[in-house]
Every structure is written in C-alpha cells, then in structure tokens.
C-alpha cells in the first residue's frame, strides 16, 4: 500500500502526466454527460422496452460499449462502434488490396490518407445505422404505448443528423484523448462505457442475492470468481512464446555489431478480441432475419435467440475457434517475418534462414493458436455459465466475453504508458521488484 501511495504521489509530481490525466478525466466527463442527452422527441420514461431488449446478445454488447447510451436513445447511442467497424474493414483491405498495402508503406502520409478514408467510411456506416436504429426504436416505443413517426420526415432527418454528429464527436474525443491524454483514446472510451455499467450491475447482483436467495456468502464467492476470471484473462492477454533469435556478428570499421540474442514474442492470443466480435456479428444474422422468415424458420432461429442456450453457445464457441485461426493467419505473416530476419542478418538457432524459418514460425503459431482459440472460446461463453448458476444478466457480462478482454487489455496498456512516463522522469514503476507492466502493444512483433 505504501508503494502504491508513493506511485500516485510521483504521478502527481510530474506536470505533463498530471495534465494528461486531468485532460483525460475532462473528456471522459463530457462523454458520460452526452450519454444521458436523449434525442429530441423521445419520452425518456417510455424507454423501458428498448432497455429490456438490450439485456442479451449483440444489443447488450452495443449498449455496454456505449455505456448505456444505446438503450437511453442518447445522441451518443451509436457510440464509437461505427468507427471501429470502419477501422476493421480498412485493416482487412490493407491485407487484401494492393492499393491499401502501398498506402500503408508510405509512412506518415499514407497513415493520414487511411485515417481520412476510415472517417469517410464511418460516415457512410452512420448514414445506414442511424435510420436503422430509429426504426428499431420506433418498434420498441410502440410496445411501450408511445408512437414515434419514422419515415421521410423531420424527426428521422434531424435524429439521424444528431446520431451521426454524436458518433463523430465521440470519435473526436477519442482522438483528443490519444493526443493530449493517457492511453489509446478510442479504446479508453470503450473501457469507460463498460466500466460505467459495473456499479449498477454489482448493486443489482448484491440486492438479488440478498432478496432472492444465496445470501452474502454466495455474493462474496461470485466476487472471488470474478477476480479469478480477471487473472485468467490477464494471463491470456499477456501469454507469449518467445522464439530466440541470433544476429550474426559484423565489423564496421573497428567496431563489431550484432552477435546478440533477442526474442520474437509470439502471442498465445494474437487475434485478441476480433474473433469474438466476428462471431457475435454472425450469430446476430439469424436473429435479424427472424422477423422476415417463415414460422418454420423462426422455430430454427429461436435456438439462436437464447444466448444462454446450448446450441447458441456451442456454435458461438466453434465460430470463435474458426475465426481465431482465420484472423491470426491474416495478421501474422511467417514469410514476411522470416524475410525481415534474413535482411537484418538474424536467424533462429538450429533453423535455416528463409523458407525453413517461415515454416518453423508457422508451426509454432499453429500450435499456439489451438489452445489460444479454445481459451478465448471459454472466456466468451463464461457469461452463459454464470447465468446458468443464477447470476444476473448485467453482472454476468463481466465474467467474460469481449468486454472482459477489452477491459484487461486497455487497463494494461494505460498502466504501461503511465509507468513509461514515470521511468522517463527517473521514478520507480508500480512494482518494487523492478518488474514492468506489459501491455498488448509491447508483445507485438
């Protein structure tokens, strides 16, 4: 505890770090305030139907990422997800399309062009998602006894503009946090949205256990299990297999370079949360089509509408394993890694440079991906197991899935950046032993 207090004091002593933390706090407060500003023409008291719809599935994920703005019909309802969707599309195009590959190699100018294209694509996605959200909102409001006229009218046009402007403003806040605050701004906004739901979830679970059964001991056991799941997620995020690399000695004038041994850190979960996001998007398709299909098809889709059911989670876990292999194969290029080693006079001891090195790295990644994908699938379905044992829906979401991995990853990245600022000013880090915090970026090749 003394070490922790001393670290906080050191953080406050550094003017730049103190300024960044206060700036981050200011932007977070602005974001949270906007999450409660309801769209004009919407009666906030009639939003219970929409909030009930977001208790499970992809809707719950969107609502959690937006910190409740989605179910509040806020001007920030669409949140940062359209920008993330656009970024994922551009990332995939960078791998598959030569034009984007060339742009990526242009350095800072290429990065600025790709950022601009990402923003344009974000606007296009918002122009589609805005009216779609309003149609869904009108259906849910009708169930609550309040009509919302959605069509080519002033309400739809003005609300779509507000939703698009709100989402772009959230994106701007994220970029400002990255530039002037602490951590990656976009990831930090998602983290805030997730954490904002935690106090309400834990109070609801506490009240449920006291009133409906289980008592205080069961609640304490749930907290202990939650901490254990967090520790497990940290191990999954930070787990790496280090491949030793030797660099050949070379003489430049009278000086000798090379001859040192380094490591290539290959992550157990190189794909991070992307397989879960892809799998959830696929699992949402039958639910979205349920209203347009026959009664026989609806009977089939009902099995997938229950995200606590066996078939939903079995298919969900299988899709995560498949997408983990798929996405890892996209982002990890053993041939390129072997070529880079060869160009820098590096080699893996006992392995011939070139093709043999690429095959060796590919074999290691294949062996790592199998346990990594299975562990990722287990984390993804843990909320369903929690629900099976009587944990409330809102609290069960913190036992696994995308939200847990994002929380762990962003917190580690933010703490690593704070620790780096401390070390730059010759202060100690968070640990007395000298151990350093490793974020996700520190383990990328």
Each model region followed by its residue ranges:
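N-terminal cationic and glycine-rich segments that engage phosphates or anionic surfaces
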Residues: 1-104, 109-445
């Amino acid at each position: 505890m003394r070490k922790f207090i001393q670290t906080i004091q050191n953080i406050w002593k550094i003017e730049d770090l103190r300024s960044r933390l206060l700036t981050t706090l200011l932007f977070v407060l602005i974001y949270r305030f906007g999450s409660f500003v309801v769209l004009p023409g919407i009666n906030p008291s009639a939003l219970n139907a929409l909030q009930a719809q977001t208790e499970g599935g992809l809707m719950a994920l969107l609502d959690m990422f937006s910190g409740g703005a989605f179910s509040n019909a806020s001007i920030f309802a669409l949140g940062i997800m359209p920008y993330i969707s656009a970024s994922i599309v551009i990332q995939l195009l960078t791998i598959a399309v030569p034009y984007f590959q060339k742009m990526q190699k242009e350095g800072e100018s290429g990065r600025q062009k790709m950022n601009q294209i990402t923003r344009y694509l974000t606007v296009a996605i918002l122009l589609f998602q805005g009216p779609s959200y309003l149609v869904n909102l009108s259906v849910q409001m009708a169930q609550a006894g309040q009509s919302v006229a959605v069509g080519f009218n002033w309400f739809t046009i003005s609300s779509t503009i507000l939703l698009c402007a709100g989402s772009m403003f959230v994106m701007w806040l994220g970029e400002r946090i990255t530039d002037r605050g602490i951590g990656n701004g976009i990831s930090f906004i998602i983290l805030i949205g997730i954490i904002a739901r935690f106090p309400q979830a834990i109070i609801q679970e506490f009240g449920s256990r006291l009133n409906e059964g289980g008592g205080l001991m069961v609640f304490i056991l749930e907290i202990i299990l939650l901490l254990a799941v967090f520790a497990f997620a940290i191990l999954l995020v930070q787990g790496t297999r280090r491949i030793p690399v030797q660099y050949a000695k070379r003489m430049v004038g009278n000086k000798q370079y090379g001859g040192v041994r380094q490591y290539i850190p290959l992550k157990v979960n190189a794909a991070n949360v992307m397989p879960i996001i892809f799998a959830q998007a696929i699992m949402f398709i039958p639910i979205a089509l349920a209203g347009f299909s026959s009664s026989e098809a609806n009977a089939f889709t009902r099995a997938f509408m229950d995200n606590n059911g066996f078939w939903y989670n079995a298919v969900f876990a299988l899709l995560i394993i498949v997408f983990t292999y798929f996405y890892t194969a996209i982002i990890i290029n053993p041939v390129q890694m072997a070529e880079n080693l060869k160009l820098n006079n590096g080699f893996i001891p006992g392995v011939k440079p070139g093709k043999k090195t690429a095959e060796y790295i590919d074999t290691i990644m294949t062996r790592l991906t199998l346990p990594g994908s299975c562990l990722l699938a287990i984390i993804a379905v843990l909320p369903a197991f929690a629900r099976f044992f009587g944990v409330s829906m809102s609290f069960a979401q913190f036992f696994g899935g995308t939200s847990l991995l994002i929380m762990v990853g962003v917190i580690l990245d933010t703490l690593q950046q704070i620790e780096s600022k401390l070390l730059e000013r010759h202060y100690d880090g968070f640990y007395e032993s000298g151990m350093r915090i490793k974020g996700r970026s520190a383990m990328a090749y």
